[in-house]
Design a protein with these regions (language model features):
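Hydrophobic alpha-helical transmembrane segments of multi-pass integral membrane proteins
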Residues: 1-134
Length: 134
């Protein structure tokens, strides 16, 4: 996330891109920080309480779907932003791949919520009892 912000600042300066003009590069770092850092801190806390990784198949499905979605979405955001800064038109392919990224994120989050729901309903939540009762 921080590297994306640095890239945005330096790349737009290097290309003499007008300050204040919008490009997808300007929001790529916030997307990476929110989707890649802050949400994973939440996922980590929920893992600690409910031991979600016990359900290996659900957890692995969530992990890979979500991360592939974030990479596709932010990758296309950066590609679109670079094209904007260079004064070139974006095309439908970039929008389509970004849309696939959003779908992967949505499916990944859905799998995560299914896993969380199952873990909440289970009488023994693995590490939850040990850490809550300690």
């Amino acid at each position: 996330g921080l590297v994306a912000g640095l890239f945005y600042r330096e790349f737009t300066k290097l290309q003499d891109f007008p300050e204040g003009e919008y490009t997808q590069l300007s929001v790529a770092h916030t997307h990476l920080l929110a989707l890649g850092f802050m949400l994973f801190l939440i996922f980590l806390a929920l893992e600690k309480v409910f031991a979600l990784s016990r359900h290996h198949q659900l957890f692995n499905s969530f992990f890979w779907l979500y991360n592939v979605g974030v990479v596709l979405t932010v990758g296309m955001q950066i590609s679109h932003g670079i094209l904007t800064v260079l004064g070139k038109e974006s095309n439908e392919m970039i929008s389509g791949i970004a849309g696939l990224g959003h779908i992967f994120i949505t499916v990944g989050l859905t799998v995560f919520l299914v896993n969380l729901g199952r873990a909440i309903k289970e009488p023994d939540a693995g590490s939850a009892n040990a850490s809550v009762n300690a």
